[in-house]
């Protein structure tokens, strides 16, 4: 059970917290609010920080969907997206769902796995609003879902073939941009660094039939010390690709 502060007079919040096994704690560091049909997370000792929400409909993710470079993006190349090939992807470290959304918007079917229940609650709320949206709702319902389990091992019990497992473990950020500082400060204090990130690679390789893609900061070592088959570099990050079989 995860402690959280919330207004116990709001049935919606009570239901969300019960669903994700979040227990009321008057002294909790974090608060969940439900305002304007949106679930948001707030750090109570930093009231000036905006709440964190998952929003697939407006803002930065919507802009990236429209103007982000389509299949020419490095992430699309990394997962093997090409003409006639629409891989099924498991995002094993979903976070706020941004990379998963990019892949879904390009045609992949994406299953998100998020082990922290507060983050999972935010993701589910973001999906709920996206599913209702007139512009993106139809394909979002078809291509993007949240798995109600906390591990890749749990997902492997489902009898469905997964082409690609995508991992973006939490790594200490050097980036000093305001957004990264704000979101990462809140996020890392909530979920902590992925100290067991190296343990994600083996189950990912067991689950994926075609490849595993690991997003890393450019200064980070290889996950679990395993050298990838190929690397796709961007300005600040890289995608390490572990190939098991050809995409077709």
From Swiss-Prot:
Key words of the record: Cytoplasm, Methyltransferase, rRNA processing, S-adenosyl-L-methionine, Transferase
Chain's gene name: rsmJ
Name of a matching Pfam family: SAM_MT
Family: Belongs to the methyltransferase superfamily. RsmJ family.
Cysteines joined through disulfide linkages: none
Top EC group: transferase
Coiled-coil ranges per UniProt: none
PANTHER family in the cross-refs: RIBOSOMAL RNA SMALL SUBUNIT METHYLTRANSFERASE J
GO cellular component terms attached to this protein's record: cytoplasm
InterPro entries (alphabetical): 16SrRNA_methylTrfase_J, SAM-dependent_MTases_sf
Protein name: Ribosomal RNA small subunit methyltransferase J
